[in-house]
Structure formats: structure tokens, C-alpha cells
Amino acid sequence: MDFNQYFLPLFQGEASLIINKKVEEFKLFDRKNKDALFEELCFCILAANTSARMALDMQNRIGKGFLYLSENELREKLKAFKYRFYNVRPRYIVESRDIVDELPYIVSMDNKEEARDLLVENVYGFGYKEASHFLRNVGVFDFAILDKHILEWLSRYFQVKKNTSRKNYLYNESIFREIAKSVGMEPGVLDLYIWYMETGTVIK
């Protein structure tokens, strides 16, 4: 399949203006600001298996509270704001605070695969999707965020692995990387185009 022709209307249309603006926003993220990095990390913890819009709402409401509120305080806030997983995610956030001081180093590592592995190993609630999401949102576009929308699209053209083990995620991502390479685009940027195509919007 010629993906250059497939994506051409999308790359030349209104979507490109929206996505280019979002990409520039990600590139400008202050990767030396450990507190801002942790707030973004918490957004990605909260976005897993729920909507990005809901997670963004929680991030806007709680903000720096991610850094200091107790597990019970976070639980009460998330419950009051009608966040779905208000019981479990506060523990993920509190137990992930140990990594705050290391975040500027991790996101600036030359070896991005190693950086992602460190996040998966050290952030509670993070798998490869969540770690890729976080890195993309702070300006690292090396990876695909293989959520349900992207996997649904990918499965129309390729046989994808269904469960979310490391091996299967990397297998599916390798397919996505080849598509991105064929159209001359970083995986984390092409991901935004497909997400826009599937949902009609771009959040983050």
C-alpha cells in the first residue's frame, strides 16, 4: 500500500495546521523542569484506559497537587471530579514520586529506548504505551502511542498482536515505524495524524 498517497489529503489539509501547532507545543516543553515533567507524567498515568480529555481535566484541576497531596487527598479529589479510577491511580502517582528528580535526565538521554525502559520499570502504572505517550508529550517523537484508536487503524491493514506484553507492543510498533519511515515522518508525529483521522480531534 502506498501510504504517501493514502495520507496526502491529511498531510495537506487542515489537520496539518492543528498537528504542527501541537508538535511545536511539545517541542517547547521545558525538559529541565522536573515538577512540570512529573505533572505531565501524572497526566499519562491518568489517561491510561480512559479518555485523554478526562485526564487533561484532572491535570488542570490538580496541577502541582500531584507533587505533594497525600494518596487519600488525591483519591478524594479524583472521586469528586468523577474520574473513573479514583481508587487505584492515586497510589500510582504517590509511589512514582521517587522518580521526580531523575526525570530531566531520563527525558534527555541519547538512548531513547533506554529512557522508555527506565520509565516502564520505575513509574507505577506505566507500560510501553504510557511511557511513549509521556515522552511524546515532552518532545520525544521516536515512538508510537499504540492506544485503541491507533491499533484499530493498524489492524485494518496488518495483522497485529492483541495483548500488551512488551514483545507484542514492540512488534506492533515495528510495523508502525515502517509506515512512518515510508512517509518520512517520526512515529510520534504520524501517531497524531492517525489519532486525528480516527477521532476528529487532537488533545495530547
Curated annotation (Swiss-Prot):
UniProt record, GO biological process: base-excision repair
Keyword DNA-binding: no
Chain coiled-coil ranges: none
Keywords noted in UniProt: DNA damage, DNA repair, Glycosidase, Hydrolase, Lyase, Multifunctional enzyme
Domain of life: Archaea
Task of the protein: Catalyzes the excision of an oxidatively damaged form of guanine (7,8-dihydro-8-oxoguanine = 8-oxoG) from DNA. Also cleaves the DNA backbone at apurinic/apyrimidinic sites (AP sites). Prefers oligomers containing 8-oxoG:C, 8-oxoG:T and 8-oxoG:G base pairs, and is less effective on oligomers containing 8-oxoG:A mispairs.
The protein's name in its UniProt record: 8-oxoguanine DNA glycosylase/AP lyase
Species per Swiss-Prot/TrEMBL record: Thermoplasma volcanium (strain ATCC 51530 / DSM 4299 / JCM 9571 / NBRC 15438 / GSS1)
